[in-house]
Amino acid sequence: APALRLRF
């Protein structure tokens, strides 16, 4: 995945 920390 490109953005691992999107909503974390």
Swiss-Prot record:
Annotated GO biological process: neuropeptide signaling pathway
Top-level taxon of origin: Eukaryota
Gene Ontology terms: cellular component: extracellular region
Location of Phenylalanine amide modifications: 8
Keywords annotated in UniProt: Amidation, Neuropeptide, Secreted
Major site of localization recorded for this protein: secreted
Subcellular compartments: Secreted
Entry's family note: Belongs to the FARP (FMRFamide related peptide) family.
Protein name: FMRFamide-like neuropeptide FLP4
Species whose genome carries this gene: Macrobrachium rosenbergii
